[in-house]
């Protein structure tokens, strides 16, 4: 174990590749709301985002340099979970779309 508590070549600053697959999603944040397609149902669930909703750490004005390593890791994990949720929602919507157009 290294002095950081992580085994060598592991941890937040590891040179190893992440165990998460790369994402090909491009994130855009339009200033206007798009009208929802009725073919996809009427309900829309906005994902909670640490960037938009809940700040990481106790201080809402905390910059990343003021957050502890553990807090940053928690934030990264939260973002990864949100990405996974959204990807699952996209897959479900694609399946619904295939059913509707077949």
Swiss-Prot record:
Residues 1-68 are annotated as: Disordered. Residues 1-18 have a biased composition (Polar residues). The keyword Transmembrane does not apply. Gene3D superfamilies: 1.20.5.430. Residues 68-100 form a coiled coil. It comes from the Eukaryota. The keyword DNA repair does not apply. InterPro entries: N-CoR_corepressor, N-CoR_GPS2_interact. Keywords: Coiled coil. Belongs to the N-CoR nuclear receptor corepressors family. PANTHER family: NUCLEAR RECEPTOR CO-REPRESSOR RELATED NCOR, NUCLEAR RECEPTOR COREPRESSOR 1. This is Putative nuclear receptor corepressor 1-like protein NCOR1P1. The gene is NCOR1P1.
